[in-house]
Regions:
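Histone-fold recognition with a strong bias for associated Lys/Arg-rich disordered tails
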Residues: 1-147
């Protein structure tokens, strides 16, 4: 993952997700952390995309919180955070989708779409909330008006 390829907003989301993982004393940076942060964005872009894709953003938010509460916590140690394999796949998928679309940077929309495709537990949360990857991609195109 090369953060230079990410928009400022996407960088901030990644950093906030890492901070969330550390604050909750989780040893791994998982896709659920990123989904939680995206769902809490002030302007509600992720929530709006999930709704536009036919999903239930409130259910996704509740389910991701449940998933995070089930993650093992560690105490002591160096506060080292490890990248979960699913998270690495999410970043790779977001970068590939951005490149394919001709985007200059990886955006939060592409991160959300990648979570729905590659996000492990976050993928399951989004699917249970009714947010399918292809529908999210269509919602992204609609919001961007093809840009």
């Amino acid at each position: 993952m090369n953060l230079d390829l990410y928009s400022d907003r996407a960088k901030q989301a990644v950093q906030s997700a890492q901070s969330l993982a550390l604050a909750r004393r989780h040893q791994q940076f998982a896709p659920e952390h990123l989904l939680k942060v995206l769902l809490e964005e002030r302007d509600g872009l992720a929530r709006n995309l999930i709704t536009a894709a036919g999903g239930d953003a409130k259910r996704a938010e509740a389910d991701v919180e449940t998933a995070l509460s089930k993650r093992a916590q560690v105490s002591g140690g160096s506060g080292q955070l490890y990248l979960d394999g699913d998270t690495a796949r999410v970043f790779a998928a977001a970068e590939a989708a951005s490149k394919k679309a001709g985007d200059a940077f990886v955006t939060t929309e592409r991160l959300l779409s990648a979570l729905a495709r590659e996000g492990g537990v976050a993928k399951t949360v989004l699917a249970a909330a009714g947010a399918k990857p292809d529908d999210l991609d269509a919602a992204i195109l609609e919001i961007r008006k093809g840009k």
